[in-house]
From Swiss-Prot:
This is Bromodomain-containing protein DDB_G0271118. Residues 134-194 have a biased composition (Low complexity). Residues 134-209 are annotated as: Disordered. It comes from the Eukaryota. Keywords: Bromodomain.
Length: 234
């Protein structure tokens, strides 16, 4: 690379950017330093120009990098801020949703337990009420049965008393019948002794009274009374 080539590129608009031009100038100075002796004036001038060129190039590069870096830094900062905000919002939303879900599940479990306890208490109370009703009904039935048993016992006692009274009456009637029979037999015997041709006859009223008394007696007493009564009496 030499100065004539660089001049031709400048005349023909061969360089599209300044970077291409400075690259050829730097290459020209490096070639001058490479292909010339250190003691030659071309090498000295090329070294001096290359030094200034590099300073200028570094200054321009730094300036361009700074100018181009500012938007990049701003963009990076903005992107970083956005990412941080997004992450923060995401974490916040995530935590909020997590807490919300946790609270929702906690409330749901609490309601579920509350409903479960409510149903358990309701069923327990319902069963307890049914047991109380059944116990009351059983107690009432037992009381009714006891009352019926007491009434039956009282009726049995009354029947026994009536039977005893009937037995006493029957025994008394039997005794009376016996005595009357004996008296009648004695009277009949006396009458027969006095009048041998006549017998004692029962009147209709006596016969009716005897039958009524016989009907009130027990079977044993009836047989005894029938044995006492004269079968030949009309």
């Amino acid at each position: 690379m030499d100065l004539g080539t660089i001049k031709g590129e400048l005349d023909n608009n061969g360089y599209s950017t300044i970077k291409d031009f400075t690259a050829d100038v730097r290459l020209m100075f490096e070639n001058a330093l490479t292909y010339n002796a250190d003691s030659s004036p071309i090498w000295k001038h090329a070294k001096t120009l290359l030094y200034f060129h590099r300073k200028h190039d570094e200054h321009v590069k730094v300036k361009e990098d700074t100018n181009s870096a500012q938007p990049t830094l701003l963009r990076l900062q903005i992107i970083q801020i956005v990412k941080m905000l997004h992450l923060h919002l995401h974490l916040h939303l995530h935590l909020h949703l997590h807490l919300h879900l946790h609270l929702h599940l906690h409330l749901h479990l609490h309601l579920h337990l509350h409903l479960h306890l409510h149903l358990h208490l309701h069923l327990h109370l319902h069963l307890q009420n049914n047991q109380i009703i059944n116990n009351n009904s059983n107690n009432n039935n037992n009381n009714n049965n006891n009352n019926n048993n007491n009434n039956n016992n009282n009726n049995n006692n009354n029947n026994n008393n009536n039977n005893n009274n009937n037995n006493n009456n029957n025994s008394n009637s039997t005794t009376n019948s016996s005595s009357s029979s004996s008296s009648s037999s004695s009277s009949s015997s006396s009458s027969s002794s006095s009048t041998t041709t006549t017998q004692k006859k029962y009147s209709d009223e006596e016969r009716r009274n005897l039958m009524e008394r016989i009907n009130e007696l027990a079977p044993d007493y009836v047989q005894e009374v029938l044995n006492i009564i004269d079968p030949n009496a009309s």
